[in-house]
Curated annotation (Swiss-Prot):
Name recorded for this polypeptide: Lipase lipl-1
Encoding gene per record: lipl-1
A Pfam short name: Abhydro_lipase
Organism, scientific name: Caenorhabditis elegans
Keyword Hydrolase: yes
Protein family: Belongs to the AB hydrolase superfamily. Lipase family.
């Protein structure tokens, strides 16, 4: 299998040949630089979690239109990326197609989060990424520490007491889990929760994570020997095997199929902007820990939403019991709007209907939107997403604010 750098060069060369232009400068830009490239203001904030991770937040405080609100304050919309992703997800399409720009132009104060261990959140008060302890976490810690820290920072800066949350993939899993663990009313900071490609169970998942779950038994002790400890960077022979197994028979460019993001989420889409693919690949994957990937694999085998399984001895130490506990989504009590696709590899429609919808309190599910011909990445990069998803959410939030909610 070609190395990541070789894949990048191949995709870049193909794009330059096919579309007749040099490499797009956005491939080397940061999220704030992309935002400013299109004439929008970009602000950067650091926030430190209770366990010492320093997360970088990106903000578009206003757009290119003059929108006034009854109380003089712009509603805050917080967008949280998915697995192996970053804040760039919301800005790498054109301004007329990217969620962050559309919401900014609609008059919202847009905040983009970055989970620990991705491109923008590689700092800790005491640890360095070269330390194995830096990577000792999964999405358990993201929901416990990262979400509260980021959201409370956005509210502190804007002087507001609640906001509207849009999550994609892991950004939904962590929010469902955070709300299910809420014992002190923290959930009141979330006015409405818009869940794109929502994840609860991944029992019926397809792609790379399904391959790993099937290939190795639950009792397998060599996860970290295979994947490496620390940042998730699989060995070449592993990804070669996965690529051949997952991508066999699919009509996709080899460079795209080699990309771990598409191996996880599904490479087939009929609504991606082909000219932007080199930019997608340049910014994604954005990094996570091996332990986080192992947690996802455990979820595939578990069939529900378990906390990280440390093994019998480790579970007794962390949870006070031998068996790993699971999150209880029936306790989620904020208004939820679901947007899920019939062609999604990671947020499989069967998992949405058979698990998520049966575990959420029906009174909290305000909308349940099934979208046709949507795969996992179409929710953030699909050309139909503005009309099918972003514009309806913009209207929902606007009406909520104007009605004084």
């Amino acid at each position: 299998m070609r190395s990541w750098s070789t894949v990048m060069l191949a995709v870049l060369a193909t794009a330059a040949t096919v579309f007749g232009h040099d490499a797009d400068p956005e491939m080397k830009m940061t999220t704030p630089q992309i935002i400013m490239r299109w004439g929008y203001p970009a602000m950067i904030y650091d926030v430190t979690t209770e366990d010492g991770y320093i997360l970088e937040l990106h903000r578009i405080p206003y757009g290119k239109t003059n929108v006034t609100w009854p109380n003089g304050k712009k509603p805050v919309v917080f967008m949280q990326h998915g697995l192996e992703c970053s804040s760039s997800n919301w800005v790498v399409n054109l301004p007329t197609e990217s969620a962050a720009f559309l919401f900014a132009d609609a008059g919202y104060d847009v905040w983009l989060g970055n989970f620990r261990g991705n491109t923008y959140s590689m700092k800790h008060k005491n640890l360095k990424p070269s330390h194995s302890a830096f990577w000792d976490w999964s999405w358990d810690e993201m929901q416990q520490y990262d979400l509260p820290a980021m959201i409370e920072k956005a509210l502190e800066v804007t002087g507001q007491d609640s906001l509207y949350y849009i999550g994609h993939s892991q950004g939904t899993l962590t929010m469902f889990s955070r709300l299910s663990e809420d014992k002190v009313g923290w959930g009141n900071k979330i006015k409405k929760f818009f869940a794109l490609a929502p994840v609860g169970s991944v029992k019926h998942i397809k792609g790379a994570l399904k391959f790993f779950a099937d290939y190795f038994s639950l009792e397998f002790d060599g996860w970290f020997d295979v994947f490496g400890s620390g940042e998730f960077l699989p060995n070449n022979w592993i990804m070669k095997l996965v690529s051949e197994s997952v991508c066999a028979g699919l009509k996709v460019e080899a460079g795209v199929c080699d990309d771990v993001m598409f191996l996880i989420a599904g490479p087939e889409s009929n609504q991606l902007n082909a000219t932007r693919v080199p930019i997608y690949v340049a910014h994604t994957p954005a990094g996570t820990s091996t332990q986080n990937i192992v947690h996802w694999i455990q979820m595939v085998r578990h069939g529900g939403t378990p906390k990280y399984d440390y093994g019998e001895k480790g579970n007794k130490k962390h949870y006070g019991q031998a068996n790993v506990p699971a999150y209880d989504f029936t306790t989620v009590n904020r208004p939820v709007y679901l947007y899920w696709g019939d062609s999604d590899w990671l947020a499989d429609p069967t998992d949405v209907t058979d698990f998520l919808l049966t575990h959420l309190n029906p009174s909290t599910v305000v909308q349940n939107n099934k979208l046709i011909d949507y795969n996992h990445l179409d929710f953030i990069w699909g050309l139909r997403a503005p009309k099918d998803i972003y514009e309806p959410i913009i209207d929902i939030v606007r009406n909520d604010v104007l009605n004084g909610s």
